[in-house]
């Protein structure tokens, strides 16, 4: 995935410090969805329900490969399509579809099947290294501070990614399979920002909020930040080793 960084000024209208929950998540749920997919609204709704569980990091990743059906997804990133295909190639099954959920970077299931998602969570918790890595995230003085602990686990290298997220977005669909519907999306990932590489040692990554990339969205819509430490590389992602999530300040550009 290719990412472009844009520098801009921000003005915060919140407290200066916010800390991620101390409890480590039991799962990272990535939903690959599309506004042009008539099977997706049920999965989008389910993700909203799962998002109320504080032990889960839930992420909505809109893809763009259904845009040719008549409606251009307003939340899609081409990088999400690339990420989904990379997962499929890594698993060796080449199964790319919507709605698809990938649990902890390892197992995929139908995104609207709650029982299958819960089963996948239970299965992946026993895989070596999955979410065994303590990760904390703090917002302080206009910076995001991410600390990744040291480990002696078998999987002790990976990439550290920061995702600006919008908790809730409603969209009027004008064409395509979902035309004339008003659909709500939860925990919409707006961008993937690589903070750096992690190599098994305790390390802190810092980035000014003012230097986060600005995608096709208004900065004031960003109200959450997720961080994911994932084995492998972007073109061949592996199990998710650690993750954290925190509420983010509402901000506006100057």
Predicted features and spans:
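Active-site-proximal cofactor/substrate-binding loop regions of enzyme domains
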Residues: 21-97
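Ligand-binding face of N-terminal immunoglobulin V-set domains in extracellular IgSF glycoproteins
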Residues: 101
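Positively charged n-region of N-terminal signal peptides that target proteins for export
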Residues: 1-5
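Disulfide-bonded cysteine motifs in exported proteins
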Residues: 9, 32-35, 243-244
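Bacterial N-terminal signal peptides
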Residues: 7-16
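Short, conserved sequence motifs used for protein processing/export or organelle targeting and
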Residues: 74-94, 107-254
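Secreted/luminal cysteine- and crosslink-motif detector
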Residues: 15, 38-41, 249-250
